[in-house]
């Protein structure tokens, strides 16, 4: 049997114990001791599970919020505004305080990390040493606890490598090599202490190597790893990479002074370009003095392996570059991106809402626990000359032939968009046919607080204690309340509050054909927030309106316009577990077509402003920049397929979450949305400056306060944000096209803080109008768009009818 290891596991617990412990601590209902007890138990259980499955060497994963924040803490790279605090108070202030660290997506995943700040006040000026205040108690304590659970020989610390850490940071004024050099003494000191504590090896995770930027960092890596290898002494260093192949970095990366290198042999599920790792190894070989960690069990997909893993391992052995005693089987990425245990799903009681995935298509998929077992099975089978259990263990489930019934027009890149009159450009439709609002119009992103009462109603519906009619009647009351609050506050464009939605992707997954959803398939998004990604198992089809009822409930109680709220096709795809038998592009087009029909249904119900959130657009970018153009082409086409049916008088809004957008602004412009709202509250001026410099010319809502913090922003704070938008020069002074809104949905906030924050937001917008001597007050200006204007151009007068490559044939459009 080949050796095995793990490089990460879900950190929240099999029943989300850590999530609930954190939330209790945040509310003040429990103390530090209770939180740590739960966290340590969750970690110990995960390590014990991996040991029981037969894993030889276990990566000691686990965090109280975020692994990058953990690194900031043990490095002592603390921004000055937090240094007056200590312990967990400081840790969580950096995560969710009033001036918290920025948040961004971790490479191309749906996990959010806290962005390190490495300016001169953290790393020190160029001529001085770093004022770091390292604290190694966390990593050393975790190692000691891991050794107690799995033994000294099997407990391996996991650290984010120094080059990746600096690459993830912001505010650093030093060149990359100098910034890394500032951190190396602290890394070396920790490695020495881990060695003294008996660590058998140390995993250093460097996913930046899989990016285009990483290929240009050989000097930084060689210098850093030479110093760390010397400091570690006899303790081996294990370089771990994942999320894609290393491309041009492979030849020099595998020669770094480490004892082992783990490589991703699979890449992103459904990617247009398959992983090139095996080809790179066949071309360049592999050092004879190193162990190879073969990431052949898919750590980002729930589908069972179809024999690919064993075939890859045998191909590796056949090259002669790696002997069986130097080959270690592992996952292609940390298993934190998967739900915890399929067994929990199969044991859950069946309800009208959720059915165990096995009920749909025979053999079930595998979650993190099953992937650990698969690692062991693959290691055993690959070493066997005649693996009799291969077909049994590796039988495909829905990842290949089981899903190949897609009609040609659903999987073949479509060729055209729609017929009708000539396109109306943004300036014409915005001026002549859409809502005309006061300067600095106010709105929210969509969701309002999800109270215990709302969650209880959903649970009662699932359990049969409420009928659908009873449930809808009670939800209608919550919608009326949300609308009433907004009108009382003077908000210009309203939302219904999304009381009926558990999650922006899961909700639509339940409404569309071809998708399955779970009851226990929770995955950490950030901190205490968890999501349940749907599983795409078949052609995605439209089964009827899913948002029109809520819109119609909101309208009678609203004097102001109400937005229709949808999740966009790329976000649904990127935040689901996609199929592997057809491309992601084909699945995105299926989603675009289905959502297109929902846009048409909302318009038919009288909706004249429709928000299609596609916050995951950027995170789906391939790590290799050479593959960006292809991805952005089909991703934007899918969005436009969804929204292109809207009339010129219907204002289309989109929302993009924590990401850096400067390098994809042309693609954002090609989306052709009338209003762009972005999660900019923690990024502040750089994003606005980039948009202004690029000549962005459509309506924009940059986000005036951070909804991820419970702190209520003051009127003056929000006003300062509005002034910064004006000062950026964006839109050349067209203040009527700068929207004032929170930076994201309000689902996780409480009602008191929500009302207080929104009241301050409305007042700040009114004061900004007055100070800039603009007309409009706090009320909505006369509407020249609206229901009457939606059909102004006559039947078939759609917003953007220019031909698009890669869209559906005319015969397929509704």
Curated annotation (Swiss-Prot):
Residues binding Zn(2+), per UniProt: 655, 657, 679, 744
Binding residues for L-homocysteine: 445-447, 498, 613
Domain of life of the native organism: Eukaryota
Pathway in which this enzyme or protein is active: Amino-acid biosynthesis; L-methionine biosynthesis via de novo pathway; L-methionine from L-homocysteine (MetE route): step 1/1
SS bonds (residue pairs): none
Catalytic center residues: 708
Positions annotated to bind L-methionine: 445-447, 498, 613
Catalytic activity: 5-methyltetrahydropteroyltri-L-glutamate + L-homocysteine = tetrahydropteroyltri-L-glutamate + L-methionine
EC number(s) given by UniProt: 2.1.1.14
One Gene Ontology MF term: 5-methyltetrahydropteroyltriglutamate-homocysteine S-methyltransferase activity
Binding-site list for 5-methyltetrahydropteroyltri-L-glutamate: 19, 110, 503, 526, 529-530, 575
Cofactor (UniProt): Zn(2+)
Keywords from the named record: Amino-acid biosynthesis, Metal-binding, Methionine biosynthesis, Methyltransferase, Transferase, Zinc
GO biological process: methionine biosynthetic process; methylation
Enzyme class: transferase
Coiled-coil ranges from the UniProt annotation: none
Its biological purpose: Catalyzes the transfer of a methyl group from 5-methyltetrahydrofolate to homocysteine resulting in methionine formation.
NCBIfam families referenced in this protein's UniProt entry, alphabetically: PRK05222.1
Protein family membership: Belongs to the vitamin-B12 independent methionine synthase family.
Protein name: 5-methyltetrahydropteroyltriglutamate--homocysteine methyltransferase
Native organism: Chlamydomonas reinhardtii (Chlamydomonas smithii)
High-level lineage: Eukaryota, Viridiplantae, Chlorophyta, core chlorophytes, Chlorophyceae
């Amino acid at each position: 049997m080949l050796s095995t290891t793990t490089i990460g596991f879900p950190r929240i617990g099999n029943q989300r114990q850590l999530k609930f412990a954190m939330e209790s601590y945040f509310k003040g209902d429990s103390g530090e001791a209770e939180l740590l007890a739960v966290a340590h138990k969750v970690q110990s259980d995960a390590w014990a599970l991996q040991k029981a499955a037969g894993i030889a060497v276990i990566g000691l994963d686990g965090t109280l919020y975020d692994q990058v924040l953990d690194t900031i803490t043990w490095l002592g790279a603390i921004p000055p505004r937090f240094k007056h605090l200590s312990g967990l108070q400081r840790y969580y202030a950096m995560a969710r305080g009033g001036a918290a660290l920025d948040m961004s997506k971790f490479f191309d995943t749906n996990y959010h990390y806290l962005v390190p700040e490495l300016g001169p006040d953290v790393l020190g000026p160029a001529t001085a040493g770093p004022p770091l205040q390292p604290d190694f108690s966390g990593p050393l304590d975790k190692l000691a606890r891991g050794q107690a659970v799995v033994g000294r020989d099997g407990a391996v610390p996991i650290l984010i490598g120094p080059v990746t850490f600096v690459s993830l940071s912001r505010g650093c004024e030093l060149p990359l090599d100098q910034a890394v050099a500032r951190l190396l003494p602290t890394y070396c000191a920790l490695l020495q202490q881990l060695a003294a504590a008996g660590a058998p090896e140390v995993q250093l995770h460097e996913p930046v190597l899989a990016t285009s930027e990483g290929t240009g960092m050989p000097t930084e890596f060689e210098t850093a790893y030479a110093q760390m290898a010397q400091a570690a002494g006899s303790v081996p260093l294990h370089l771990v990479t994942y999320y894609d192949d290393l491309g041009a970095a492979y030849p020099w990366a595998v020669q770094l002074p480490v004892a082992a290198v783990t490589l991703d042999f699979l890449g992103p599920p459904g990617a247009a370009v398959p992983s090139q790792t095996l080809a790179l190894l066949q071309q360049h070989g592999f050092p004879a003095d190193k162990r190879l960690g073969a990431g052949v069990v898919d750590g980002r997909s729930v589908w069972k392996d179809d024999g690919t893993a064993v075939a890859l391992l045998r191909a590796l052995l056949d090259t002669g570059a790696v002997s069986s005693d130097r080959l270690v089987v592992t996952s292609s990425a940390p298993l934190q991106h998967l739900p915890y245990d399929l067994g929990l799903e199969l044991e859950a009681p069946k309800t009208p809402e959720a059915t165990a995935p096995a009920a749909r298509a025979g053999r079930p998929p595998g979650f993190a626990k099953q992937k650990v077992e698969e690692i062991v099975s693959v290691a055993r089978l690959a070493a066997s000359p005649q693996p009799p259990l291969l077909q049994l263990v590796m039988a495909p489930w829905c990842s290949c032939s089981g899903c190949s019934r897609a009609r040609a027009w659903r999987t073949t890149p479509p060729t055209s968009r729609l017929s009708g009159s000539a396109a109306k450009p943004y300036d014409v439709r915005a001026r002549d046919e859409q809502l005309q609002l006061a300067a600095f119009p106010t709105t929210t992103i969509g969701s309002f607080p999800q109270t215990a009462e709302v969650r209880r109603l959903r649970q009662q519906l699932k359990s049969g204690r409420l009928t659908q009619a009873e449930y809808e009647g009670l939800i209608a009351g919550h919608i009326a309340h949300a609308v009433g609050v907004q009108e009382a506050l003077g908000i210009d464009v309203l939302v219904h509050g999304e009381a009926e939605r558990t999650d922006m992707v899961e909700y639509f997954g339940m409404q569309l054909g071809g998708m399955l959803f779970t009851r226990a398939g929770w995955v950490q998004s950030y901190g205490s927030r968890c999501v349940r990604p749907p599983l795409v198992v078949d052609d995605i089809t439209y089964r009827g309106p899913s948002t029109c009822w809520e819109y119609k409930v909101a309208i009678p109680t609203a004097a102001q316009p109400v937005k229709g709220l949808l999740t966009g096709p790329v976000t649904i795809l990127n935040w689901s577990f996609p199929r592997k038998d057809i491309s992601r592009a084909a699945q995105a087009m299926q989603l675009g077509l289905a959502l297109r029909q929902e846009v048409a249904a909302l318009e038919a119900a009288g909706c004249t402003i429709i928000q299609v959130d596609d916050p995951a657009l950027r995170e789906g970018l391939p790590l290799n920049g050479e593959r960006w153009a292809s991805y952005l082409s089909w991703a934007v086409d899918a969005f436009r397929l969804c929204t292109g049916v809207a009339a010129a008088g219907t204002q289309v809004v989109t929302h993009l979450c924590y990401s850096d957008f400067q390098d994809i602004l042309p693609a954002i412009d090609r989306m052709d949305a009338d209003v762009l709202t972005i999660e900019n509250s923690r990024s502040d001026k750089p994003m606005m400056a980039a948009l202004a410099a690029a000549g962005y010319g459509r309506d924009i809502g940059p986000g005036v306060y951070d909804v991820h913090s419970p702190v209520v922003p003051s009127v003056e704070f929000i006003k300062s944000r509005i002034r910064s938008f004006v000062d950026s020069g964006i839109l050349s002074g067209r203040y009527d096209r700068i929207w004032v809104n929170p930076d994201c949905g309000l689902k996780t906030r409480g009602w008191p803080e929500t009302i207080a924050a929104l009241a301050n937001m409305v007042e700040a917008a009114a004061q900004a109008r007055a100070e800039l001597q603009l007309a409009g007050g706090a009320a909505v200006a006369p509407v020249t768009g609206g229901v009457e204007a939606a059909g102004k151009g006559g039947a078939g007068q759609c917003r953007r009818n220019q031909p698009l490559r890669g869209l559906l044939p005319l015969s397929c459009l509704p």
